């Protein structure tokens, strides 16, 4: 009898954990942009603009390849203020869409501009997919956005 109870408890636990992996509610809209392979230099290349009405938190997810070269930098700026400057480690094509970087960021009221660059005097080949989710949908100025990057389920 004890063995039966242990098996039932284990089965309940396994089924309960499996249920936790399924989304139970909508997270709202997602903004996503896929940049094809391009050469970066010291001049920042804008890849995505996200206008918001008021400051809000969001989850940033990105994956990239630099053909195993160091030096590419991901920037997030708003009205001349640098909100994020992340030097990207060398990454191979095999890591693209397999390894994702995830972190919470703050989007400031106004235009939040994501861009990429390489060190001065160097060029780095880069491909990136970037997405934002878990943000306050009401703060997003969708009419000022490229509709191709906004995914609303």
PLM segments and residue spans:
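Edge beta-strands of jelly-roll/beta-sandwich modules across compartments, strongly enriched
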Residues: 72, 120-134
């Amino acid at each position: 009898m004890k063995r039966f109870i242990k098996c039932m408890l284990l089965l309940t636990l396994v089924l309960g954990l499996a249920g936790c992996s399924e989304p139970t509610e909508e997270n709202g809209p997602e903004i996503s942009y896929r940049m094809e392979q391009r050469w970066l230099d010291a001049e920042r290349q804008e890849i995505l603009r996200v206008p918001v009405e008021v400051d809000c938190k969001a989850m940033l997810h990105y994956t990239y390849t630099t053909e195993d070269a160091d030096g590419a930098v991901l920037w997030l700026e708003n009205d001349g203020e640098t909100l994020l400057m992340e030097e990207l480690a060398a990454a191979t094509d095999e890591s693209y869409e397999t390894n994702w970087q995830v972190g919470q960021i703050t989007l400031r009221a106004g235009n939040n501009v994501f861009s990429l660059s390489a060190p001065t005097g160097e060029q780095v080949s880069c491909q990136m997919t970037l997405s934002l989710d878990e943000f306050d949908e009401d703060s997003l100025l969708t009419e000022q956005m490229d509709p191709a990057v906004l995914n609303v389920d």
